[in-house]
Amino acid sequence: MLDIKRIRNNPEEIVEALKKRRGEYPIQKLLATDEKRREVIQKVESMKAEQNKLSKQVPQMKKNGEDTTELFKNLKKLSDDIKNLDDDLKDIDDEIREYLMEIPNTPNKDVPVGLDDTENLEMRKWGEPRKFDFDIKAHWDLGVDLDILDFERATKISKSRFSVFKGKGARLERALMNFMVDLHTDKQGYTEMNTPVLMSPSAMMGTGQIPKFKEDMFYCEKDDMYLAPTAEVPVTNLLGGEILEQGSLPIYYTAFTQCFRREAGSAGRDTRGLIRNHQFEKVEMVKFVEPSTSYDELEKLTNNAEEILQLLEIPYRVVRLCSGDLGFSSAMTYDIEVWMPSYNRYVEISSCSNFEDFQARRANIRYRDENNKPQYVHTLNGSGLAIGRCFAAVIENYQQADGSIKIPEVLQKYTGFDIID
């Protein structure tokens, strides 16, 4: 969430920044409630000063044999009034926090202003899309024809938009996961984590999934827990409520998890194949860094994700999201989009974001600076990568005229085979 002091001191700046997101946010309600809070605090402090003043009169009045009945009556009333105002203050604090939870992060000054993904800014491309001299197949047809994907049985045991990986397909999926995690841990300096996927409401709140996106989540009502939509939630919240010792940053974590999303607002989009499933696998990278380094760390994070596609030798491009396409918690995001031959376009396979101190304030993650003073960390995360989409990109880009699929050389030590036919 945003710093209430920043909003209070620079309301016009915040309003102008949030206009770029094209939404309606309760800034004025927040400021009015904040003003009310300060008035109540001032009133409480005045009453406490009066209470203290009257209390000091008691010993002298008793010493002089004076009647203290009226004095104690006044002290009792002051005490009751202070308690009532303290209760009001708790309600006001809750109201302020609710407003803050509804307000998204402010876009970084270098984020392009735009309405939707058509106005994202292309930063760079890598590789050239392969020119096929035969009629290509989409990954869902390739997978079924080679008996490595089974959508029909997945629907039978669950519902639509679930997938079963089978035989060499299951091996290829596992190979991708192992390859990604090994790259992040052995070469890029991340520590591997294995976390739960059932999340408490406070964890979901910490990274910004709720309350804004509650309807997109799978919720276990009986236990009041959510299925994690991304490893960003458990991994970021691992350090929730902690003050990290001076010199402990940066911290890099990576995790492979199952992810679960209702995709409530995506009806009719990418409903075939592996692109938009309710359950999917993903390797996530999460960073906790000092504020002064966070944008350099964002570039490194994005490069870490890009390296996977470079080693797989699959073309991709990197775009900087415009303000209208930017995620709720993000100050800046790069999307990596992989070339998908059947779509004849680039498709998102990773989002790499700098949240600045937005998530850290919600989850209360701090570190001690050089003066030993607690400060909020900056958090970043990125997909490294979405495995289902990467699987789809591999089999589409490596399909052969005879219907077989070559295995990228970098994966062969993980699969134990070099072709699926």
Curated annotation (Swiss-Prot):
EC number: 6.1.1.11
Residue numbers binding ATP: R261, R262, E263, E348, I349, S350, S351
Pathway: Aminoacyl-tRNA biosynthesis; selenocysteinyl-tRNA(Sec) biosynthesis; L-seryl-tRNA(Sec) from L-serine and tRNA(Sec): step 1/1
CDD domains referenced in this protein's UniProt entry, alphabetically: SerRS_core
Reaction it catalyzes: tRNA(Ser) + L-serine + ATP = L-seryl-tRNA(Ser) + AMP + diphosphate + H(+); tRNA(Sec) + L-serine + ATP = L-seryl-tRNA(Sec) + AMP + diphosphate + H(+)
Any Gene Ontology CC annotation: cytoplasm
Gene Ontology BP, a term: seryl-tRNA aminoacylation
Gene Ontology molecular function: ATP binding; catalytic activity, acting on a protein; serine-tRNA ligase activity; transferase activity
UniProt-annotated location(s): Cytoplasm
Classification via SUPFAM superfamilies: Class II aaRS and biotin synthetases, tRNA-binding arm
First-listed, main subcellular location of the protein, grouped into a coarse class: cytoplasm
Family matches, as Gene3D superfamilies: Bira Bifunctional Protein, Domain 2, Serine-tRNA synthetase, tRNA binding domain
Protein keywords: Aminoacyl-tRNA synthetase, ATP-binding, Cytoplasm, Ligase, Nucleotide-binding, Protein biosynthesis
Transmembrane annotation, as ranges: none
Positions annotated to bind L-serine: T230, A231, E232, E284, S383
Residue stretches in coiled coil: none
Entry note about domains: Consists of two distinct domains, a catalytic core and a N-terminal extension that is involved in tRNA binding.
Family indicated by similarity: Belongs to the class-II aminoacyl-tRNA synthetase family. Type-1 seryl-tRNA synthetase subfamily.
The protein's role, per its UniProt record: Catalyzes the attachment of serine to tRNA(Ser). Is also able to aminoacylate tRNA(Sec) with serine, to form the misacylated tRNA L-seryl-tRNA(Sec), which will be further converted into selenocysteinyl-tRNA(Sec).
Quaternary structure note: Homodimer. The tRNA molecule binds across the dimer.
Protein name from the UniProt record: Serine--tRNA ligase
Lineage: Bacteria, Bacillati, Bacillota, Tissierellia, Tissierellales
